[in-house]
């Protein structure tokens, strides 16, 4: 995770600069992994998984060991971590376009305790990267179709506060319990 964090910091630094820097394959996959980790390693996802799983039992020969709640949570965190990488590999095959929205308004992008957004019949994956950057992956759910050899990359400059408010409203709608903003004005969703 620390390696992914370093790559994410580099991506954010480069994308926030005035010079347009295309995302290379390593950065692309790091973005997908970061997105997937943010999607699967949330309190809500943990709770959903714990609701569905009554218990874990380890078998060693004839011996059965029932995991306690603490051990169950630790094992589940590992499972969700692995699932995150599997999901990143899946959406890597489906992704045909990446858009990075650069915010040039006085309102910042907000984030939440569940920042990864998956919507529009699971054809769009999106997430705020910083108060000034928002990433969107367009996915092709028809895996049988041939995808382009190279993923389309586009940087979109946003100067309209209404667009930022709409994105922030979307982030709000997909949040679990908490929203995080730099300023109170960032939490105003009036259009």
Regions found by a protein language model. Give the residues of each.
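Alpha-helical structural context detector biased toward long hydrophobic helices
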Residues: 1-191
